[in-house]
Design a protein with these regions (language model features):
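A secondary-structure boundary/capping signal
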Residues: 106-107, 133, 176-177
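Catalytic-core segments of class I nucleotidyltransferases/pyrophosphorylases
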Residues: 103, 121-124, 153-253, 264-265, ...
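Conserved donor-nucleotide/metal-binding helix-loop-beta segment in metal-dependent transferases, i.e.
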Residues: 113-141
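A structural signal for short hydrophobic beta-strand segments in well-ordered beta-sheet cores
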Residues: 25, 146-148
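Charged/polar low-complexity intrinsically disordered segments, enriched in acidic residues
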Residues: 255-257
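Conserved N-terminal catalytic core of the sugar/cofactor nucleotidyltransferase
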Residues: 2-5, 13-16, 26-27, 31-106, ...
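Active-site glycine-centered loops adjacent to acidic/histidine catalytic or metal-binding residues
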Residues: 9, 108, 136
Length: 300
């Protein structure tokens, strides 16, 4: 499976903060926002990743993440020149996807929870169709909504309905089979001229190929599209990290945990950052622990 991060939005709701730089590069507490969705794909075991940016911020993303080799992964980049909706990502990425399954995550979505890596692994066990994730919200009219029957089988999807049929939002993480580009090409742009991700999911639903997994108690989903939600996310990350003494979405830690890279390789790649910040002190502590104990890293 390959992965796509859609990070092309202008972030106008955050102006003036996002005028000089993409909102996806703004910090959520101690790390850039892009680290959080990238960590989700890495936790799912995905190593080939495409980041779709806007034209202005393309170079900034490359400067931050490079080709991904420092994490033992492969990162490519493409530009979305015109905002044509979330599903447009699959048309932009068609030559990257080829005949593979693909995961798409929105650049401003943060996920956290005990056992999240195992949860993602279970979701990847579906060998056909699409898998999306439902999360209970108090304001469903703001989101794409999935309705279930009495057996919790998805029966309908609606985009920001005035009268929601459920309180379960479809979050910004989607897994698709190799037919996703074909199905995307069949979509008609919405009234706002965009290829809607809800319409794509409806194609899979109509074919009885849509799987919905619920992010239940113990999992947190944060959509950081506003100033208040960014502050909420930063406070959440700060609190969890302070209480547990562990980083959230530390890419180097996940790379070690998934064995994408060895401690020695990572130490060499991070030499210029040694002693520069608390974040890198944390990474070096992990490296030293692994080298001294010769044990595999356990991600808690």
């Amino acid at each position: 499976m390959k992965g796509i991060i859609l990070a092309a939005g202008a972030g106008t709701r955050l102006y003036p903060a996002s005028q000089p730089i993409s909102k996806i590069l703004l910090p959520i507490y101690d790390k850039p926002m892009i680290y959080y969705p990238l960590s989700t794909l890495m936790l799912a075991g995905i190593k080939d990743i495409l980041i779709i940016t806007n034209e202005l911020d393309h170079d900034n993303f490359q400067k931050l993440l490079g080709d991904g080799s420092q994490f033992g992964i492969n990162i490519q980049y493409k530009i979305q020149y015109v905002q044509r909706g979330i599903a447009d990502a699959f048309l932009i990425a068609e030559d990257f996807i080829e005949e593979d399954d693909v995961a798409l995550i929105l650049g401003d979505n943060i996920f956290h929870g005990f056992g999240f890596s195992t949860f993602l692994k279970q979701a990847l066990e579906y060998k056909y169709g699409a898998t999306v994730f439902g999360y209970r919200v108090k304001d469903p009219e703001r989101f794409g909504i999935v309705e279930f029957d009495k057996d919790m089988k998805a029966i309908s999807l609606e985009e920001k309905p005035l009268n929601p049929k459920s309180n379960y939002a479809v979050v910004g993480l989607y897994f698709y089979d190799k037919h996703v580009c074909e199905y995307t090409k069949s979509l008609t742009p919405s009234k706002r001229g965009e290829l809607e991700i809800t319409d794509l999911n409806k194609v899979y639903l109509e074919r009885e190929q849509l799987n919905v997994k619920i992010l239940g108690r113990g999992f947190t989903w944060l959509d950081t599209g506003t100033q208040d939600s960014m502050l909420e996310a930063a406070n959440f990350v700060r609190t969890i990290q302070a209480n547990k003494g562990q980083q959230i979405s530390c890419l180097e830690e996940i790379a070690l945990y998934k064995e994408f890279i060895t401690p020695d390789e990572l130490e060499m790649k991070l030499a210029r950052f040694k002693g520069k910040s608390a974040y890198y002190d944390y990474v070096y502590d992990l490296i030293n622990e692994m080298k001294s104990t010769q044990k595999k890293l356990v991600l808690k």
